[in-house]
Amino acid sequence: MMPPWLLARTLIMALFFSCLTPGSLNPCIEVVPNITYQCMDQKLSKVPDDIPSSTKNIDLSFNPLKILKSYSFSNFSELQWLDLSRCEIETIEDKAWHGLHHLSNLILTGNPIQSFSPGSFSGLTSLENLVAVETKLASLESFPIGQLITLKKLNVAHNFIHSCKLPAYFSNLTNLVHVDLSYNYIQTITVNDLQFLRENPQVNLSLDMSLNPIDFIQDQAFQGIKLHELTLRGNFNSSNIMKTCLQNLAGLHVHRLILGEFKDERNLEIFEPSIMEGLCDVTIDEFRLTYTNDFSDDIVKFHCLANVSAMSLAGVSIKYLEDVPKHFKWQSLSIIRCQLKQFPTLDLPFLKSLTLTMNKGSISFKKVALPSLSYLDLSRNALSFSGCCSYSDLGTNSLRHLDLSFNGAIIMSANFMGLEELQHLDFQHSTLKRVTEFSAFLSLEKLLYLDISYTNTKIDFDGIFLGLTSLNTLKMAGNSFKDNTLSNVFANTTNLTFLDLSKCQLEQISWGVFDTLHRLQLLNMSHNNLLFLDSSHYNQLYSLSTLDCSFNRIETSKGILQHFPKSLAFFNLTNNSVACICEHQKFLQWVKEQKQFLVNVEQMTCATPVEMNTSLVLDFNNSTCYMYKTIISVSVVSVIVVSTVAFLIYHFYFHLILIAGCKKYSRGESIYDAFVIYSSQNEDWVRNELVKNLEEGVPRFHLCLHYRDFIPGVAIAANIIQEGFHKSRKVIVVVSRHFIQSRWCIFEYEIAQTWQFLSSRSGIIFIVLEKVEKSLLRQQVELYRLLSRNTYLEWEDNPLGRHIFWRRLKNALLDGKASNPEQTAEEEQETATWT
């Protein structure tokens, strides 16, 4: 019987191995389940057995497979793409590809294959692309691919092939369209080498012979041969050899001929114009010249290419292109990465397409005369335009495509008059000037595509897009709007399906901006400064499927979120400043409920409060809000009650003291004739004028002044009430600008009103010391009303005015004053003496 400990170990091991799935030991990476597997550089010596039979794509590159044995891939009947690059394969046995009836792409790059058997490629009945670069292949004759009747592209570059002779089995490859023989050791091309092409004129083959050290092409080697494309780049060591070889291309009919060199590999120091004379006997539809040094500016020497339909110059050191003969029948001209010092002067009646891009150096646009031009690409040149754009600039009214992107300053001076056929217009990353001063696009009713992204445009004119009734794509990212508010500029573009407003510094959206865009499908509002998500802006977008509001500062929603269009399928709200607080509970709950169309909702994080920073929005717990609401409600009610009681006590405290004082002093005599309320700014006038004339004059009055009569150690408010109001018959209010602006003076005045009401007598005398603006006076409504309805004294600093002022003031103070015989006699005596 098995010992217990041994039985336990056995069961544990059995359980462990039973949990392992077949794929758990597979070193390959599952890119697409059951479809694509990445097994690169896993030190595999054979094809893994546990890859699913349904696999269509396998990358086995950089594994030491050494030998491909028969039936190596028989388990992968659905395989379509196979990469065996640099697997050290030396031998391919017969039937190695057995069962791969659907394989269309096979890559054997970098394998030192020593020899091929006749059946090395048997079974590949659907192969279309075969790459055998760096496989030590010595000739096409020894390459057994005659049975690959579906083959379209053959790449045998960078091998040891010395002859370009196309074997007889090529007649079986009726679908072959491209053969790459570049970077081999082919030095000569003879008549017999291309006999297959001569006997099969129906073959439309592209042949790449670049980087072969060709020094001789036999006369009539290409006579009667038809090719789709012939590439001869970096083949010739001297101009004379190149000229002779090109002359021996006579009789060739080629759709596209590519000559020249490579950017980093130059054999010819000087490209002499006479070289091109060798092409006069070659029928060429399209010609391309690449990376040549010291190229002649005399384009007339291209007379052998006068009848080509397309001319292309790429990386050519040409500095001027002018005086191109009008009889040249070029329909397409491309000038890419050249070194032009000025814009080409062109007058070509047949030219339909002009591409001038990535020129090395800044140039200014010049007017051209191209009546047939329909396509114009002038992008990435640092071009400057002093005026754009109209028929007079281009000399054509057939233009449909205009690309002026990635240039310098473009001054808009016309509204495309004569260019009404335009359908595509691109200004991105150029600086547009004056584009908002008028309706620059008014004539472009047929325009379908407009890109003004990153053009330093500040949109402050709602009519900027007037006339664009057919526009379906509008890109305007990286610009700005007046007051950072998206204004109603889309009223006329009712056919828009794509609108990009990203990085426009937008903070607000005007009401009804999108209401006419019923066909809009994609709206990009990302990378702006929007604070709220307002669904009412989008409820008229009946066709909207994608809305991107990511990278804004959105904290919460505004309004009812159910207003989003039913067609909306993708909505991106990531990277916003979402506030995960109970105040925004409805918005947070809505986010949780809309997982089906919110993009990357599981990555949405909270920005505030601080304790929830970087927390996931989906983790916000709504239940805590109910508890908080109860606590907050009780707290708020308590605070309101306490605050109300405190406010009432504070507000009426002094009035209560005043009432109590009135009862206390109601039967006693007043000590003072008047209590003076004034601003400290007017104290000089009170001391030098008021006190001097009333207390030292005739009759004498006794005034209550705070700086003299208030009791030290007692609160100011208590002194005002007890010493000022309760012991005075009247109150003198000295009104001035500073008085109205002083909160303390206004407080004293309000207490005086209460005192007057409680004493049931007219005891307040107003003195307007200086002219006070009505606007300032209206700030104190009650004071303004009293001054409007009651008589007051105005101080006038002149003899007559002073005399009247003091007489009226003394009469007002005498009103209600009890008579004192001794004081009256004394005053009469002083009066007589004074008289």
Swiss-Prot record:
Keywords recorded for this protein, A-Z: Cell membrane, Cell projection, Disease variant, Disulfide bond, Endosome, Glycoprotein, Immunity, Inflammatory response, Innate immunity, Leucine-rich repeat, Membrane, NAD, Receptor, Repeat, Signal, Transmembrane, Transmembrane helix, Ubl conjugation
PROSITE patterns membership: TIR
GO MF term set: identical protein binding; lipopolysaccharide binding; lipopolysaccharide immune receptor activity; NAD+ nucleosidase activity, cyclic ADP-ribose generating; protein heterodimerization activity; signaling receptor binding; transmembrane signaling receptor activity
InterPro entries per the UniProt record, alphabetical: Cys-rich_flank_reg_C, Leu-rich_rpt, Leu-rich_rpt_typical-subtyp, LRR_dom_sf, TIR_dom, Toll-like_receptor, Toll_tir_struct_dom_sf
PANTHER family from the UniProt entry: TOLL-LIKE RECEPTOR (PTHR24365), TOLL-LIKE RECEPTOR 4 (PTHR24365:SF521)
Main location: membrane
Glycosylation sites (chain numbering): 34, 75, 172, 204, 237, 307, 492, 495, 524, 572, 575, 613, 621-622
Annotated protein name in UniProt: Toll-like receptor 4
Effect of residue 712 to H: In Lps-tolerant mice
Stretches that traverse the bilayer: 639-659
The TIR domain, residue ranges: 670-813
Organism of derivation: Mus musculus
